Amino acid sequence: MTEHAPEQLDAEFQVDKLTPDLVSKIVRQDITQPEILSQRWDLEDCTFIIPLRIETRDRMRNILVTLIYLLRNFNTKVIVKEVDKESIFKQSVLPALEEACEDFRMEGLTHIFEQSDEYTFHRTKIINDMLWMVDTPVTCNYDCDVLLPKTSYPYAVNMIMNGVEGARVEGEKWYPKVVYPYGRGRYQAQLHTSDEEVTKFINSKFDFEVFNKWRPYDAKFGFCQFFDTKTYKELGGENEGFISYGYEDDERHYRFAMITDAVARMDERVFHLEHARSKNSWFNNPHIEGNRKLWEKLKSCKKEELKFYYENVGYAKERRAIPVA
């Protein structure tokens, strides 16, 4: 069968680098002013969903930094689902987070804990558990170790909500269903941080210049993505056939590019807070071969075959049958 991935991987609309003029249309003010940068911006139309298992100390630090960044900078909703033997988040992260954020900023956070002795972290299923709780028009599938420039968040949401003028046809708006808020290529900044450095980052009102030990690295399809929530659910959310780690990011991009032809990418950087990796977050996990076979199968599908698969695959049918509150 013909492989359709190559042409779809390149069929993305590239957004020019963000300028104050572009973002000021969203926040209605000039974001170059320091007092504006310290403001909390409105992202009520977006819910961030973050799957979590804290296996290392640096992972604990990363989720704390990420949540402080999101909750201080944006009026938004964040759902964190933690699956583990016991809740390290409740024991160690939540008290520090409450100390760092005022009560009104914590209102947007929902923490769900599911007790499990299972070693395997079924990331795709956990993401879907949260996705089907989302009631906002935009959803961001968000890794716990990721930071974006502050301006990237409202611009990505605005693209989905309000479209992009003249992106494909002169004088017409184009509405992406998925936005990758970072460039493809060496747009990843790998951050090797310390407690002292992230504390300085937070206290400096999130000045990324604080991080002096980083290197540029490849960025493709992981980290985080903004979705039109309705479309995300209609096309199956995350494929629960992918277990633990491996190939789910590739398949997700291929699926939405192939079926919707409405995937946008921003020419911006993504910051990744580095961390130690267990088998659940690397290619030596026991499910990697099954994941690879599923990816090989799906990337050989044509558009109508992919649509048929996601209309009929068991987990997605069960999810869509859940009544909406």
Where on the chain are the PLM-derived regions?
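A conserved hydrophobic helix/loop-capping motif in glycosyltransferases and polysaccharide synthases
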Residues: 46-62, 73, 81
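C-terminal catalytic/acceptor-binding lobe
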Residues: 2-32, 41-43, 58-62, 219, ...
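Conserved glycosyltransferase catalytic-site signature
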Residues: 123-128, 145-146, 153, 220-224, ...
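Short beta-strand-to-loop acidic/aromatic patch adjacent to the donor-nucleotide binding site
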Residues: 136-149
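Short, acidic, metal-binding catalytic loop of nucleotide-sugar glycosyltransferases
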Residues: 65-77
